Amino acid sequence: MSRPTKADWADDEEFDDPSALPPQQITTNKDGTKTVVSYRFNDEGKKVKVTRRIKTTVVREHVNPQVAERRTWAKFGLEKGHAAGPSFDTTSVGENIVFRPSVNWKAQAAEAEKNGGEKGSIKDQLKDKKVKCRICSGEHFTARCPFKDTMAPVDEPGAGGAEGGAAAGEDAAGGLGAGGGSYVPPHLRKGAAGGGERMAGKYEKDDLATLRVTNVSELAEEQELRDLFERFGRVTRVFLARDRETQRAKGFAFISFADRSDAARACDKMDGFGYRHLILRVEFAKRAT
């Protein structure tokens, strides 16, 4: 009489592994779409059911017959045996750029080559250039000048010079009082009568062509916003508010155009535009009072 063999636990078909996931289910719907039901574990280790609805769209593209034939060739050389299509480690797929030369592109190319030979490259031209402030002539950008709110640019009327220095000396001396030595506020000193006009004149930021964009993604970049709005006209300034600690966007930005008509067209087209899974709200910026 033969001895009965001991059953192996791996042969038990009814064994249920609590960590195993149910198989993926694919259902074809009447409208041609497919419903894919799959399971996965989330970060907390819980089993999560994921339902996706997939619609297949066939896009017909007319290509050159010779190009279509070359795509059917088997790969050779170092790529022999690899799957069809471009390989990401050897091929870089870029954007298809449509080149439209101008009518007189030959003359422009010849002129650019001639000017480049005479003046040298742009790098050589800017090699000895230094940043110079238009307000105080210091070696910093004009926007970062500490005197931009109190001084006019050097090439504007009222800027500091030989005569301006003398006048400044008189104002500085008179700033402490007409003669009694008492303190006089800056807006009551000599030459400050037109302060209000100066603030409301050419030195005030022109908000007539500035758009306020809200509901901006915190992952947005200034260059991306510039590319989005430059389709409607020349953009002079892009300001994206960021958090000081995280350097992420706060959710709003200001876009300034050179022409108000371009700003109006951009406001009409971009209001309600989807950007980074959010709907942008675009309106004209209100003038600060």
UniProtKB/Swiss-Prot annotation:
Record-annotated membrane-spanning stretches: none
Location(s) in or outside the cell: Cytoplasm
UniProt KW keywords: Cytoplasm, Initiation factor, Protein biosynthesis, RNA-binding
GO cellular component terms, semicolon-separated: eukaryotic 43S preinitiation complex; eukaryotic 48S preinitiation complex; eukaryotic translation initiation factor 3 complex, eIF3e; eukaryotic translation initiation factor 3 complex, eIF3m; multi-eIF complex
Ranges for domain RRM: 209-287
Annotated InterPro entries: eIF3_g (IPR017334), eIF3g_N (IPR024675), eIF3G_RRM (IPR034240), Nucleotide-bd_a/b_plait_sf (IPR012677), RBD_domain_sf (IPR035979), RRM_dom (IPR000504)
SMART domains: RRM
Gene Ontology MF terms: RNA binding; translation initiation factor activity
Matching CDD domains: eIF3G, RRM_eIF3G_like
Region annotation (Disordered) ranges: 1-33
Primary residence: cytoplasm
GO terms classed as biological process: formation of cytoplasmic translation initiation complex; translation reinitiation; translational termination
Functional summary from the UniProt entry: RNA-binding component of the eukaryotic translation initiation factor 3 (eIF-3) complex, which is involved in protein synthesis of a specialized repertoire of mRNAs and, together with other initiation factors, stimulates binding of mRNA and methionyl-tRNAi to the 40S ribosome. The eIF-3 complex specifically targets and initiates translation of a subset of mRNAs involved in cell proliferation. This subunit can bind 18S rRNA.
Family membership noted in the UniProt record: Belongs to the eIF-3 subunit G family.
Assembly and interaction partners: Component of the eukaryotic translation initiation factor 3 (eIF-3) complex.
PANTHER family with a match to the protein in the record: EUKARYOTIC TRANSLATION INITIATION FACTOR 3 SUBUNIT G (PTHR10352)
Name of the protein in question: Eukaryotic translation initiation factor 3 subunit G
Organism: Emericella nidulans (strain FGSC A4 / ATCC 38163 / CBS 112.46 / NRRL 194 / M139)
